[in-house]
Structures are given as C-alpha cells and as structure tokens.
C-alpha cells in the first residue's frame, strides 16, 4: 500500500497501479485528470500538482508519490474554480473540453509562481506539455491571462441566434465535472480489452485463449464464434468484421481477434496479451499501384481492390487546353493523417435487469443511430432492443464515424449479462479508426494571357486502406471539389479509391476537399507566375460568382457571393504585407455543408415543455466540441424566448435513440445547418400547439433536392445545397522561415455564435498548419503497420508553435438555409496548405507538391 494526501485528505492505495493516474481514477474515483495517452505522458490531460509542481500523473509512479501532497482540480479553492471556469466560459477557451482540466492545473502552477507577471508567451511555452486538438490555443491563453491578471470577464448571457452565448456546459467542462464515458461508473461494471492482430494480411489458423481465461480476474473471453448475429458492420458497405474468425483473413493492423472481460481494466489488458494466435501470413498489399495491377485481393471477403471511381466531364478539355496560352501539369501528393482527438474511444454497455433482453449503450460516436443498427445486427436482435445514448465526446473530427469498440462492448455485455466498459489505449485508437486519405493527384490546367482559366483535367488515386468506411465518398468529394471555388469552362475529373492493407481511410475534417485544394491552389499560383499577376489577382479573376457554372456543372446561387467577399476582406491585409516585402501566400477554398450528391438528408428534433418550467431539447447530432448543443439552446431562445420565460439552467439538451430523430452521421459540416433547422421547426410546432406542456413537439428539416455527382441526365446538377468559403493569408518571417501570422476571412452565412465560429476557425487553422508543415502518419510498406505510434511523433503543433491568428467573419446568407447558415467546421483548413505552399515559394523559390512541406535547406527537411 502507498500513502499520500489528495486534496488535503490522507489516502492509502494499492501498489499494483501502474501509475498515479490509475490510482486517482480507478481507486479513488477522482476523474478530473483525464487519460488521453497513458503511460506515455504526451498529451498533458492527466496533469496534477505534486507538492505544488505540475506533473503528468500517468508517468508518475506511486513510489514517487508516497508521502507527498497531490492536488487535482477537485481540490482547488472555490474562488480558483470559479475564476477558471468563468474565464474559459467567457473567452470561449474550450470546445470538447477533454484537455482543459489538465491545462487549468498547469495554469494554476504558473499563476501561483508568477501571478500578474505571467506572460502569454511564457504560458504558451509551458503548455508544450499539453495538446489541444480543437481550439488552436488562442482562446485558452486568453482565458489563462484573464485569471492571472485577476481580470475575469463576465460570462455573456445565454441568448438567441447571433449572440456570444457561452458554450453549453462550459463551466462543468472546464473543471472536469462533466463526465465522459470513461468517467462513468455503474454497480457491477466489468472491463473489456481487445486482442488485435499481429499481421495486416494473414489467415487465422487458431486462437488459443486458455491462458487468458485462467488469468486473475478474467470472467470471459469471446471470439468471432460467439457472435450471435452478423459478423460484418459498416456505415455504407457491411464489409468491416467485428472480429476475424478462425479461417478468416486479417486486412489491416486494427483487426480484432478476441475480447477479454475482467474485473479491472488492468486485468483485462494483461489477459488479452496472453492470447496466442497461429497465422498463415501473406504479403500485405500496401501500394496503390500494386493493388490496381494485381489480381490478388487485398481485403478479405471483397471482390476487388477498386473501392470506387468518381468521374465527370464538362466541355472539350483537349480542345480548350490546346487553345490555352499557358498549360501546366503537376502531380501532388498528400499524406495520411491521424485525428488525434484527445479522448480515446470508449463505450459502456448495460444489459437490462429484467426479462426484456435489451441493452443500453453509451457511445461517443458520430452517428448513434448507425451505432444502434449495427449493434443490433451483431447481436441478432431487433433495433428496438438497443438504445444508444450519446455521451458528449472528447473530440472526433470524423474519426468517430465508424464504430470502434461499440459492438465489441455491447457483445460482451450481452453475452456475460453484466455492465461492461471498454476504453481503447492510445495505441489501439491509432490502429483501429480510419485516417485522412493519402491521395496522389495529377493536375493539368490551362489559362489565357489574362490568367482566365480555360480547362482542367484531374486524375486522382486515393489509398483507402482496408475497409470501405466512407472512403468512396471522400474521393467523390475530392472529385467534386477538384476545381475549388473557381469557374473553369471545361473540366474532366476522375478519382479512384483503392483498397490496400494500410490503415483505413475515412472521414476527417475537410473530407477530400483539403487534398484537392492543395493541388488547385498550387496550380493557380504557378499559372499566376507564368502570366505575371499576383496570387490575389488570379483568384479574383476566376472566383465563382452567382449564376456561373461550378465544377461538376452546378449553377451557383447567391450563396457563392461569399467567395469573392472573402477575397475582398483579405485584400487590405494582403496589400499591407506585400508593401512590407513579407513572404506571403494566399489560399481560397470552398467546402460543402451536408452530404449532398443525391442523398436525402432528413433530421428531426423534439422540444418538450414541462409544467415546472424545465425544457427538453432532443436532436440527432453528436456534440464533439463544435457547439451543436449550444446552437440548439440558442435557437430555442430565439424562437420561443419572446413567448415564454426560459431559464437556461432548466434546459436539457439530449441525444439518444429513444426517438427516431437522426439520419446518419454528424459529418460534412451539417450539424448546425440541419440541427438548427430541425429545432427551429420543433419550436414552430410548439407554437402551433399553443405551447402545450408534457408532449413532444416534433420538427423536421430536410435537404432532399441534391443530385448525384456525374449524373448525365441532369441539366443543373445541384451536388450540394450549401457551401462555406474562406480566404486565408499566410505571412512568413523571413529570418526564421516560420509562419508568423495567419489572417482568415471566412464566410459563415450567419454567425450563429461568433465566439464558437472564431474558435472553430482558429482550431482549423492550427490543424491546417500541421497538415501543411509537420503532421504525418506513415505506415511501413512491408508490414502495413503505422510507424508513428505516439502523440509526439505525429508532428502536431504545440501552443508555442502556433502563429498569431486573426479571424474575419464574413456573412453572406445561404438561400434556403435556416438563418442563412453555412458550415464552418471543415472549411477552416481547406485553403491552409495551399497558402503555406505559396508563402514558402516566396521565401525560397521552391514550388511544393508534397505534404508535409519543409523550407528548402532547413534542418527540419
């Protein structure tokens, strides 16, 4: 046993814990320190104070803790807790919130040491021990500065659309009081761990589980033979095995072979490592060109290595290129990227205690209705026997669209008839969930003597890894966005998604538009250089305008005026930097909101008023930091606040499958668009019913008028109903060769909440700069296994590395959209890499065509 004090109380804990974090969370039930990467100590989420010094508790042994004083956020004084909570709420210093408690602890250590003399740049340096994937750090540093200077601003009131309403549950998130799935405890709860494959392409000959079954604390071990229903799941294609059976073949590094259920997480993980597997190993297919050329099938139970082909043509490209004054050809390469959300995937499943044979699953996924349907499929039961409730997650960015461990956890709970929780380790998370696609894009583009574009031909091949996920849609989106926000009279595009034994390629913020825009912006800058005009000028001359035909043939509506408006908003900053002789680059981008491409998007919401003044708002969208619950609250107040008195403290926002409200994933920057529309309609229903109490007032919003990409029978193919636009200016420091400043003008249609909009954009810029300059998630070409298996190795920018950011909100309303909304979550990193590439070219004269980029001759190259 080990004795020490926690928050002023003497405690004694078991010595068997691998580190202090485990003792705090698993034995003492102190959950403000979060487990984002234990035991590597690279995310900072588990930071606590030991004798007044900030340390990461997942790298602190109990031996080093003995006799010392440990303080967590729970032990802060009420004055300190209120100051930090209010500052982060008022400044918008959090989104998903998972990283914030650890950051607050480190901030306290620095404020205790330096007080009002704490400088922003010093705090940024101390945050080098922490990662935040959501915010871009700017508003975090602002909040800390307010606390340090004893100048905490008042929290804005909760109000309607267009106001700086504080984030829903902001104070609870800042203090670590609003729990995530791993913070949940229920009586009789067991823990599950997974055994993953050791080979990316191998036939399973046998799975020996005896040693695991007899290990301490183990209650059960399950393999594919224990699945009572279907083996395969998937969002679009049912091609992803929940587990690989004996006689089956693995297809990527994240394939699951067995589930171990034990009394503790440590016991489950230790026992899972005891499972022995006999493999017949095959050579992995890890190169897209090999996959296209070979007759061998990379992925088990599929009939070929081409997942999809997306193509369209408009005009005579050959003739237009032949008549062009300038024609440029270039091949661009983008890399695979890991989402690195701070909360690893977690699921809690609880079977019913009566004879009804039901199971309730707590999920952090981006599509709980899809989760429900596939869980029922695996268990071989009706959808009505499964309830999935969303627990607001600690970040996702597309990486939690596919199920990770939801089906495994539900299966274990169902079979053992007890509550089961499964939390992935950071390494398991890296191996299992889908990544951003690496894509090779060959562009050939022409223009006339004035820089007016004439034609574009694109041939793209994307490595979609093993299973379908939404890979075909990512390449479809890349194809649709291939020409960017520009008018190109003739166009010919083909994009192929290829199956390999590499990590699965799926949804990631930008969803194919990032890759396309990196190439398109690079082509524009090369043509501008040929013609002898500026980067701003060539974009201004070619930007899409209302009434023009865009890319796949869609005649653009008034909403596209935002593209030119963003260019106009950035122009003074562009001219000023140019006058100073600073190396700069400009990027312009567009990104759809919604799925489009002929998909019928329908969503519903419920508003329920009670006699005690409480209100329930139920919608179908996953809160993952972007603020959809806040928007739902604002719409409620906007629509009903003048009719009834609404106490925000008595409004509860709920997302679960007890009502049929959802359709698909929270993806494509459509959460605010669709969610606001549905809540607005539900409020209208409540008004029509005389604001009746105790009943569900249901509203529906639908976008069912879009057209499939490449449909030749449609005169005006409306591929997407809504687009967001952004212009970003990247300014370099000539001496250091680093990005000094980013100015971002974003057309958001209507700034539903300016603070949330700014935060989304700042976080996107941070992610976009990493994508452009430092981030990578390569895999070994001989094995298919990823090689960067720690958070630090991913190349994510830390707080001290993030340049100054200035956000300009442009509002050009979108016709037919509620409140004129356009999506903002993804567009923020669509133009970034192209802008950085142009700035680097101005710095050293080298054109870039491969991500991530480095300054020529730098020691980072």
Locate each region found by the language model.
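Intrinsic disorder at enzyme termini
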Residues: 1, 126-181, 552, 564, ...
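Signature of N-terminal electron-transfer/Fe-S-associated modules in redox systems
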Residues: 1-158, 597
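Glycine-rich loop/linker segments at domain edges
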Residues: 92, 163, 169-175, 304-347, ...
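Flexible, low-hydrophobicity surface segments
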Residues: 148-304, 327, 415
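Short beta-strand elements
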Residues: 172, 178, 346-351, 440-449, ...
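Phosphate/diphosphate-binding loops
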Residues: 256, 262-264, 418-465, 677-697
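Helix-loop-helix junctions that connect adjacent transmembrane helices in secondary transporters/permeases
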Residues: 293-379, 543-614, 634, 697-718, ...
């Amino acid at each position: 046993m080990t004795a020490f004090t926690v928050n002023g109380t003497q405690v004694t804990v078991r010595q068997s814990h691998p580190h202090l974090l485990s003792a705090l969370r698993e034995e003492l039930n102190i959950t403000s320190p979060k487990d984002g990467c234990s035991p590597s100590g690279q995310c900072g989420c588990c930071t606590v104070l030991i004798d007044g010094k900030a340390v990461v508790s997942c790298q602190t042994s109990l031996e080093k803790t003995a006799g010392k004083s440990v303080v967590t956020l729970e032990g802060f004084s009420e004055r300190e807790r209120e100051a930090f909570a209010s500052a982060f709420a008022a400044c918008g210093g959090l989104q998903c919130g998972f990283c914030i408690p650890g950051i607050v602890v480190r901030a306290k250590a620095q404020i205790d040491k330096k007080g009002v003399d704490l400088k922003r740049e010093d705090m940024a340096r101390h945050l080098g021990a922490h990662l935040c994937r959501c915010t871009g750090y700017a508003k975090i540093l602002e909040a800390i500065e307010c606390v340090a200077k004893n100048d905490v601003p008042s929290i804005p009131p909760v109000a309607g659309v267009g106001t700086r309403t504080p984030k829903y549950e902001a104070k609870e998130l800042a203090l670590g009081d609003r729990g995530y799935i791993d913070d949940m405890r229920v009586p009789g709860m067991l823990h599950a761990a997974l055994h993953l494959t050791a080979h990316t392409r191998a036939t399973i000959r046998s799975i020996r589980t005896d040693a695991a079954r007899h290990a301490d604390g183990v209650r059960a071990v399950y393999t594919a033979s224990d699945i009572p229903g279907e083996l395969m799941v998937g969002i679009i294609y049912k091609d992803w095995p929940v587990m690989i059976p004996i006689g089956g073949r693995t297809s990527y590094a994240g394939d699951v072979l067995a589930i171990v259920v034990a009394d503790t997480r440590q016991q489950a993980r230790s026992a899972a490592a005891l499972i022995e597997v006999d493999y017949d190993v095959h050579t992995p297919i890890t190169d897209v060109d090999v996959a296209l050329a070979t007759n061998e099938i990379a992925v088990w139970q599929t009939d070929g290595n081409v997942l999809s082909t997306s193509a369209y043509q408009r005009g005579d490209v050959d003739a237009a290129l032949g008549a062009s004054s300038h024609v440029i050809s270039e091949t661009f390469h983008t890399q695979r990227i890991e989402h690195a959300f701070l909360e690893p995937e977690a699921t809690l499943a609880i079977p019913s205690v009566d004879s009804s044979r039901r199971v309730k699953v707590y999920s952090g996924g981006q599509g709980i209705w899809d989760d429900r349907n596939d869980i029922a499929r695996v268990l071989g039961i009706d959808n009505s026997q499964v309830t999935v409730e969303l627990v607001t997650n600690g970040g996702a960015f597309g990486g939690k669209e596919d199920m990770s461990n939801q089906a495994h956890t539900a299966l274990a709970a169902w079979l053992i008839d007890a509550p089961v929780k499964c939390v992935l380790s950071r390494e398991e998370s890296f191996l299992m969930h889908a990544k951003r696609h690496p894509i090779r894009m060959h562009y050939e583009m022409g223009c006339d003597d004035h820089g007016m574009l004439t034609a574009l031909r694109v041939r793209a091949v994307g490595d979609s890894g093993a299973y379908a996920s939404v890979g075909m849609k990512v390449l479809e989106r890349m194809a649709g966005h291939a020409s960017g926000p520009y008018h190109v009279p003739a166009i010919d595009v083909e994009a192929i998604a290829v199956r390999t034994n590499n990590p699965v390629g799926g949804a990631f913020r930008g969803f194919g538009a990032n890759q396309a825009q990196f190439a398109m912006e690079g082509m524009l800058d090369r043509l501008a250089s040929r013609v002898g005009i500026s980067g701003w000028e060539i974009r201004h001359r070619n930007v899409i305008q209302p009434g023009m035909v865009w890319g796949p043939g869609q005649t653009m509506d008034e909403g596209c005026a935002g593209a030119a408006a963003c260019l106009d908003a950035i122009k003074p900053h562009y001219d000023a930097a140019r006058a100073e002789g600073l190396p700069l680059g400009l990027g312009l981008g567009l990104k759809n909101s919604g799925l489009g491409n002929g998909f019928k998007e329908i969503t519903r919401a419920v508003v329920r008023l009670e006699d005690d003044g409480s209100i329930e708002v139920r919608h179908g969208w996953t809160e993952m930091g972007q603020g959809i619950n806040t928007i739902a609250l604002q719409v409620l107040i906007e629509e009903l606040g003048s009719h009834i008195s609404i106490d925000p403290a008595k409004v509860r926002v709920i997302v679960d499958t007890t009502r049929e409200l959802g359709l698909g994933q929270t993806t494509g920057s459509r959460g605010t668009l669709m969610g606001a529309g549905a809540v607005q309609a539900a409020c209208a229903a409540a008004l029509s019913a005389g604001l009746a109490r105790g009943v569900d007032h249901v509203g529906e919003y639908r976008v069912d008028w879009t057209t499939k990409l490449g449909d030749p029978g449609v005169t005006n193919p409306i591929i997407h109903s809504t687009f967001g636009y952004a212009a970003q200016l990247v300014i370099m420091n000539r001496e250091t060769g680093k990005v000094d400043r980013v100015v971002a003008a974003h057309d958001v249609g209507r700034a539903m909440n300016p603070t949330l909009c700014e935060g989304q954009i700042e976080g996107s810029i941070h992610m976009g700069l990493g994508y452009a300059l430092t981030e990578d998630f390569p895999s070994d070409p001989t094995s298919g296994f990823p090689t960067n298996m720690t958070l630090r190795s991913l190349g994510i920018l830390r707080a001290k590395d993030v340049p100054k950011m200035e956000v300009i909100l442009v509002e050009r309303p979108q016709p037919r959209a509620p409140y004129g909304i356009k999506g903002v979550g993804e567009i923020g990193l669509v133009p970034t890499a192209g802008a950085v590439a142009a700035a680097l070219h101005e710095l050293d004269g080298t054109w870039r065509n491969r991500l991530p980029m480095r300054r020529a001759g730098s020691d980072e190259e």
